[in-house]
Amino acid sequence: MQTTYLSMGSNIGDRQYYLHEAIRLLGKHPKIMIEKVSNFYESSPVGGVKQDDFTNLALKVATLLEPLELLDFIHEVELSLNRERKIHWGPRTIDIDIIFYGNSEIQEENLIVPHKEAFNRLFVLKPIFELLSNDFKYYEPIREAIAKLSESEQELHVIEEEKSPKNRIEEAVKEILFAVGENPNREGLLETPARVAKMYEEILSSQRLTNFNEYKLFEIDSSKNDSIVLIKDIPFYSMCEHHMLPFFGKAHVAYIPDGGRIIGLSKIPRLVNYVSRKLSVQENITHDIADILTDILKPKGVAVLVEGRHMCVEMRGVKKVNSLTKTSYFLGEFKENGEKRMEFLESLL
């Protein structure tokens, strides 16, 4: 296995969450073993782009992946954590760089090792230096560079590592169990906090996502643009943001293509999943489906109708079992043309 040093940084949203998630995802690969993690640091941004401070750390990993294979997997991890490459040296949810790959010197079109900017970046070298033994090939050059950069205007200081979201949820669930009169240490509840944390990771998986990108567009004969494309009875499950109780039901989604652009049929259910897997209300889910579909497809019109049962209505309060809430939202021709709107509604009967 090859010893490799990675530098990681984040300056958007919950920075430590993205760093923890990146470490977790890297460690799940069967050919990567996380050996050491540095302290967490806060650093001022470089590169001249106005943005928030970064949280940085370094990893020492052992890997069986070749350098370009490792780079490809790193890009997959970054993409899964909502990394967008819009501004060079700009803000990002996560940035992972290969700094050293053993003692190798690599000159590829998309990979240079040692990283070409490493010896100019205090936030790269200082965390990595924590992880090195003094027989490492670049130990002395790194030590000398740190001494020089420490006299520059680059700001860097150690910060406290925060608890992971999983640990926070587990501790909160234990407190809730105490508060309702339970004993979280009794046999039936010992693993409940961990189960709840894992459940929230699944059912609120869109909570930190800002863009829907699980789709592909296709072209068809533009003469068929007036035909309505409808997918109905799409199941969804979500969590009410008012009481954190489930609500669930079916979504019916239609659009009228424009310019021959259509979206893969399976992507509309994926869109419904995306908007529903976070704390929300039914009205927002209805609008979000229509707005996102309009943004990515630019159709002539979009129609969405959502039917839902709400546990905050059925389990508590008024306790009206089996009551059904319907919400609808129309854009473009569905909003302006009553015949098109009626065609959509009649197709649901």
UniProtKB/Swiss-Prot annotation:
- GO terms of biological process kind: folic acid biosynthetic process; one-carbon metabolic process; tetrahydrobiopterin biosynthetic process; tetrahydrofolate biosynthetic process
Instruction: Outline the segment boundaries, as ranges, of region: 2-amino-4-hydroxy-6-hydroxymethyldihydropteridine pyrophosphokinase.
Output: 1-226
Superkingdom is Bacteria
Pathway the protein takes part in: Cofactor biosynthesis; 7,8-dihydroneopterin triphosphate biosynthesis; 7,8-dihydroneopterin triphosphate from GTP: step 1/1; Cofactor biosynthesis; tetrahydrofolate biosynthesis; 2-amino-4-hydroxy-6-hydroxymethyl-7,8-dihydropteridine diphosphate from 7,8-dihydroneopterin triphosphate: step 4/4
InterPro entries membership: GTP-CH-I_C/QueF, GTP-CH-I_N, GTP_CycHdrlase_I, GTP_CycHdrlase_I_CS, GTP_CycHdrlase_I_dom, Hppk, Hppk_sf
Which SUPFAM superfamilies does the entry link to?
6-hydroxymethyl-7,8-dihydropterin pyrophosphokinase, HPPK, Tetrahydrobiopterin biosynthesis enzymes-like
Q: Which reaction is catalysed here?
A: 6-hydroxymethyl-7,8-dihydropterin + ATP = (7,8-dihydropterin-6-yl)methyl diphosphate + AMP + H(+); GTP + H2O = 7,8-dihydroneopterin 3'-triphosphate + formate + H(+)
Which keywords has UniProt assigned to this entry? Answer: ATP-binding, Folate biosynthesis, GTP-binding, Hydrolase, Kinase, Multifunctional enzyme, Nucleotide-binding, One-carbon metabolism, Transferase
Record-listed E.C. numbers: 2.7.6.3, 3.5.4.16
Region feature GTP cyclohydrolase 1, mapped onto this chain: 226-349
**Molecular functions (GO terms):** 2-amino-4-hydroxy-6-hydroxymethyldihydropteridine diphosphokinase activity; ATP binding; GTP binding; GTP cyclohydrolase I activity; kinase activity; zinc ion binding
Q: Which GO terms describe its cellular component?
A: cytoplasm
The entry assigns this protein to a family as follows: In the N-terminal section; belongs to the HPPK family. In the C-terminal section; belongs to the GTP cyclohydrolase I family.
Indicate the quaternary assembly. Answer: Homomer.
By what name is this protein known? Answer: Bifunctional protein FolKE
